[in-house]
């Protein structure tokens, strides 16, 4: 699987984080957003560094599988792009109206 950047992980957690166990979610949050190392998370949870690494890897895979099946983020981004195009078109319409009004005033 491809490596995810922080914004992608953030979206996955926002959309699907509640589908993970509390421990999985907390490990992801600690690692990616609280900037804790694997060793620090392991020490806080009294488990091995390898266990935390495996948990984070498994959790990311689960989040990606949720997205692959449900496509919530894909649909969200699609809607966002459509809204942006509508907004841009409305702005273009307003600019054209203003130009037409200016042309009528100058005649």
From Swiss-Prot:
Top-level taxon in the UniProt lineage: Bacteria
One Pfam family hit: UPF0122
InterPro entries associated with the record: RNA_pol_sigma_r3/r4-like, UPF0122, UPF0122_fam_protein, WH-like_DNA-bd_sf
Residue intervals passing through the bilayer: none
Function: Might take part in the signal recognition particle (SRP) pathway. This is inferred from the conservation of its genetic proximity to ftsY/ffh. May be a regulatory protein.
Similarity-based family: Belongs to the UPF0122 family.
The protein's name in its UniProt record: UPF0122 protein MYPE4850
Source organism of the structure: Malacoplasma penetrans (strain HF-2)
Lineage, opening ranks: Bacteria, Bacillati, Mycoplasmatota, Mycoplasmoidales, Mycoplasmoidaceae
């Amino acid at each position: 699987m491809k490596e995810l950047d922080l914004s992608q992980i953030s979206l996955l957690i926002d959309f699907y984080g509640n589908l993970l166990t509390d421990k999985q979610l907390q490990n992801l949050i600690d690692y990616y957003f609280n900037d804790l190392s694997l060793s620090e998370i392991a020490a806080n949870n009294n488990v091995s560094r390898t266990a935390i690494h495996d948990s984070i890897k498994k959790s990311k895979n689960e989040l990606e599988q949720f997205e692959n099946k449900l496509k919530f983020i894909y649909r969200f981004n699609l809607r966002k792009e459509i809204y942006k195009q509508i907004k841009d078109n409305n702005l273009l319409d307003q600019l054209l109206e203003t130009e037409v009004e200016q042309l009528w005033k100058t005649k």
